[in-house]
Regions:
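ATP-binding N-lobe of GHMP and related small-molecule kinases
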Residues: 1-99, 113-123
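Active-site nucleophile and cofactor-binding loops and adjacent substrate-binding regions
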Residues: 102-103
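Histidine/cysteine- and/or acidic
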Residues: 107, 111, 122-130
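ATP-dependent small-molecule kinase catalytic core of the GHMP/sugar-kinase superfamily
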Residues: 127-155
C-alpha cells in the first residue's frame, strides 16, 4: 500500500445495443455482448482514503440499498485482493442520480479505478472492467469510456 488516498473519475454511458440476461449472476456476467457510448461530460468522481476505524464510512448520503450494494462490492474486491483496510469513501456525480443516465455504471467504475490506484494494484483495463462489472454490468463499459463494445465471454 503506497498511497493513503486516491481519486478517480468515470463517465456514465448509454447502451446503443443492450445485453440481455446474465450468463453468471454471481459474477454479474452478461449472456450477450453490448455496445455503448460514453457520456464523457457526465461523470462520477470518487475519492478513497484509509478509514481510521474498523468500518467503511461515506461522506455521501446513500440510501440503505445503495449503501449495502457499495459495501458488498468493496468487501468482495477486498477479499479477491486479500486487502483488509477499511475505507472512507467520498463520491459525487456531476449529473442527477436515478434519471436513467447510468450513475451506477460510472459510480462502480470510478470506485474500481480508485481502489486500483489506492492499493497500487496496476490492473489491466480488461481486469478493471471485470472488477467494475461485479458492482454494475454497465460499469464494465464505463471503465473504458468512449465507444465500447463488450463481447460476452467465459470471464
Amino acid at each position: 500500500m503506497s498511497n493513503s488516498t486516491a481519486t478517480a473519475s468515470a463517465a456514465a454511458n448509454i447502451a446503443l445495443v443492450k445485453y440481455w440476461g446474465k450468463a453468471s449472476v454471481e459474477n454479474n456476467q452478461p449472456a450477450t455482448g453490448s455496445l455503448s457510448l460514453g457520456l464523457e461530460d457526465l461523470r462520477t468522481t470518487t475519492t478513497l482514503e484509509y478509514a481510521t476505524g474498523d468500518q467503511d464510512t461515506f461522506d455521501t448520503e446513500l440510501d440503505d440499498k445503495a449503501r449495502r450494494r457499495a459495501l458488498g462490492f468493496l468487501d468482495r474486491i477486498r477479499q479477491n485482493h486479500q486487502i483488509a483496510q477499511r475505507l472512507h469513501i467520498t463520491t459525487a456525480n456531476n449529473f442527477p442520480t436515478g434519471t436513467g443516465l447510468a450513475s451506477s455504471a460510472s459510480g462502480f467504475a470510478a470506485l474500481s479505478l480508485a481502489f486500483d490506484a489506492l492499493f497500487d494494484l496496476r490492473l489491466a483495463r480488461s481486469d478493471l472492467s471485470r472488477v467494475a462489472r461485479l458492482g454494475s454490468g454497465s460499469a464494465a463499459r464505463s471503465v473504458y469510456g468512449g465507444v465500447v463494445e463488450l463481447i460476452s465471454s467465459e470471464d
